[in-house]
């Protein structure tokens, strides 16, 4: 098979706007580490702006449930941000691994603010834990931006990658594909028609390109620059 008349096309983008939410249930007292509980449901929530008068999902009870949201915050500008949550009952918020709001107790709907958090433009890790005790729950996540705008954080400023692999399908057996962005980021050999590049260390989307080597090591294809390459991307060989 010759790749001279073929291109790689992205058939699935790994970057999705929102945060990955994992839903749990608990007994007795709300646990300090909810992620040690069995996961009842999992989904990507575009933004955190919920008032539940019943179960948050069909698989989760209306009482004694918890949610762990994780992903990335996309800061639009450099400056000091103040984060706020409205919660009923408890919640904790981390930005770049630092606990900035800790309100882990039973309470009616209450608004809590973080201290000022200095952010550079771009991607920052974010994690929000929430638990609810009785039927009726509230959880909202917002910010006050450096320009003074206060809002629930929009989905366009939240992102998650679908997996820690970049998958390429349709290349010949024993070919190798490399991902480059100034330097080589990763590579994988084609096995059973599929190459899987480890994207665990790609912490935010990158603009890069692929090089394809045949079984003898010769470069047979170099892609154009592709924007926002990230874990969960899937590519296929297509004829041109």
Task: Name every feature range the model reports, one short phrase each.
Residues 184-194:
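Short, acidic Ser/Thr/Gly-rich low-complexity loop/linker segments typical of extracellular
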Residues 84, 194-200:
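Short, surface-exposed beta-strand/beta-hairpin micro-motifs centered on an aromatic residue
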Residues 6, 10-164:
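Acidic/polar, compositionally biased interaction segments
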Residues 139-140, 215-235:
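Edge beta-strands of extracellular beta-sandwich domains
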Residues 1, 9, 128, 205-218:
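Short, aromatic- and glycine-rich surface loops/edge beta-strands on solvent-exposed regions
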Residues 86-90, 169-175, 205:
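Short proline/glycine-enriched turn/loop motifs at strand-loop junctions of beta-rich domains
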Residues 120, 200-206:
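Surface-exposed, short loops/turns at beta-strand junctions within beta-sandwich domains
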